[in-house]
């Protein structure tokens, strides 16, 4: 049941996870809101449509599916690099977020006068170990992470909402760039997360053993869905949560709220590591992929 809603959890979590780093200094700029809405229509919506369509067409995960589709279309092998790039980008995003979580947790502990007697890089490495272990649970940590993040934000709301003065300002290139960046963040920056989520649903539906029955079952599974029926709810959820995330981007959280928020972030980021591990497992096997993902992310976390 949880697998079926993985894409919706991701649609809700990505804005909450990443918008705080991309939000404008003043979220009251009406022109920025309009630019972001245009970017959501022109960038986010087509990307989600494309990922769902590719999931239907390939009936496989992004890395294996892209290799399959390029062979069938006799396309340039360079397109096969998309799957590898998606796995790499997921690891990089996870490492950056875990590094940010380490800083946030340390700041909250300082406010609580409970600073651990360990170096900051050791704390980041410890959080990395916890996150990679959580990644073994697959989709299960997503609702837990969402719940913790929401509770943390609600504790911030009890201290008062940030004051926002809405005004129309001049449109400039940096606003366009920020609006497009937020739209890309909403869809995971092209990591193929929605493609992967739809593939999980398809694999869950397919339960037959022999090849012929399996193929027919997959065809039936694909025919049960329509692209718009899946894409529009995901896109609307991205839009609604994105608005909330932008409005709350300037809000300060109390120490306990910060701890809950960042612990929830670790649960969410574990899914990114799970995703990258599953992609690499297509080529190297699960154990080697898990170790490679852990080592790569750990190096990035400590380096940052």
Give the ranges of each region predicted by the language model.
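Membrane-interface "cap" regions at the ends of multi-pass membrane proteins
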Residues: 1-22, 47-52, 56, 63, ...
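Alpha-helical transmembrane segments and their helix-start/interface "positive-inside/aromatic belt" motifs
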Residues: 1-2, 30-37, 76-88, 136-149, ...
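Transmembrane helix-boundary motif of multi-pass solute transporters/channels
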Residues: 1-38, 162-171, 235-255
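Hydrophobic alpha-helical transmembrane segments of multi-pass small-molecule transporters/permeases
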Residues: 5-8, 36-41, 73, 77-94, ...
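Membrane-interface helix-loop junction between the first two transmembrane segments
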Residues: 19-32, 51-60, 164-166, 201-212
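Inter-helical loop and helix-membrane interface segments of multi-pass membrane transporters/permeases
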Residues: 23-27, 62-88, 93-143, 157-181, ...
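Juxtamembrane transmembrane-helix boundary signature
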Residues: 35-70, 196, 272
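Membrane-embedded translocation segments of transport machinery
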Residues: 141, 150-304
């Amino acid at each position: 049941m949880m697998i079926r809603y993985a894409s919706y959890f991701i649609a809700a979590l990505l804005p909450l996870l990443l918008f705080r780093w991309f939000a404008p200094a003043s979220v009251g700029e009406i022109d920025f809101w309009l630019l972001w809405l245009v970017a959501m229509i022109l960038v986010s919506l087509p990307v989600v449509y494309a990922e769902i369509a590719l999931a239907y067409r390939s009936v496989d995960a992004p890395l294996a599916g892209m290799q399959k589709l390029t062979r069938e279309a006799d396309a340039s092998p360079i397109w096969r690099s998309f799957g590898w790039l998606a796995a790499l980008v997921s690891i990089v995003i996870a490492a950056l977020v875990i590094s940010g979580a380490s800083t946030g947790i340390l700041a909250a502990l300082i406010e609580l006068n409970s600073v651990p007697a360990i170096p900051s890089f050791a704390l980041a490495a410890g959080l990395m170990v916890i996150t990679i272990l959580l990644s073994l649970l697959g989709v299960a940590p997503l609702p837990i992470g969402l719940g913790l993040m929401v509770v943390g934000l609600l504790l911030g709301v009890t201290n008062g909402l940030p004051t926002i003065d809405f005004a129309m300002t001049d449109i400039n290139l940096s606003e366009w760039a920020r609006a497009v960046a937020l739209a890309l963040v909403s869809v995971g920056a092209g990591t193929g997360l929605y493609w992967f989520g739809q593939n999980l649903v398809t694999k869950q539906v397919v339960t037959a053993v022999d090849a012929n029955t399996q193929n027919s079952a997959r065809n039936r599974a694909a025919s049960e869905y329509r692209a718009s029926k899946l894409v529009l709810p995901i896109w609307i959820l991205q839009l609604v949560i994105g608005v909330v995330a932008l409005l709350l981007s300037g809000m300060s959280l109390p120490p306990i709220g910060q701890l809950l928020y960042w612990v929830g972030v670790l649960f969410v980021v574990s899914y990114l590591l799970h995703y990258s591990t599953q992609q690499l497992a297509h080529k190297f096997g699960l154990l080697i992929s898990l170790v490679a993902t852990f080592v790569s992310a750990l190096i990035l976390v400590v380096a940052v």
